[in-house]
Amino acid sequence: LPFIDNKTTMAADSSSTVMELLKLLQDRSDLTLLTNSAEAIHVLAQSEIKVVSTGGELNKNTLSLQGRITKEIISRYHVDIMVMSCKGLDINSGALDSNEAEAEIKKTMIRQATEVALLVDHSKFDRKAFVQLADFSHINYIITDKSPGAEWIAFCKDNNIQLVW
């Protein structure tokens, strides 16, 4: 995973896609993770990763911590990279999500990160969702499972986004 090999601090959202990445990293004793994911906190409790919880109110549907306290805690930290997923990607609108509370937490994490990586499967490209999460000027990497097509490849190249599939 070259995009995170030299990173020592990371923020992660509560998406199932990012959870799969975190499982691959659990032997990294040099990594500190800031997350609002109750699942990540639980799963990584026995790992080598140093886990920092954001605190906040638990959303039982998403198993994520949310609210004012969560945003305040995130704002106290700075991370090398923030990894997140989203519900859709639109060339004109950017990264989109379906839950406003989740989007606010992710936006706070983005502000506290040097770099941002989007982990999305191929179905998210050219897909709209309810809430604007981030425009592409905030995204450094898009990691996906299949080639998204010529238009997206050119768009990422033109916007200095490293596209990995």
Task: Specify the residue positions occupied by each region the protein language model found.
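HTH-adjacent hinge/linker in prokaryotic transcriptional regulators
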Residues: 1-16, 22-30, 45-49
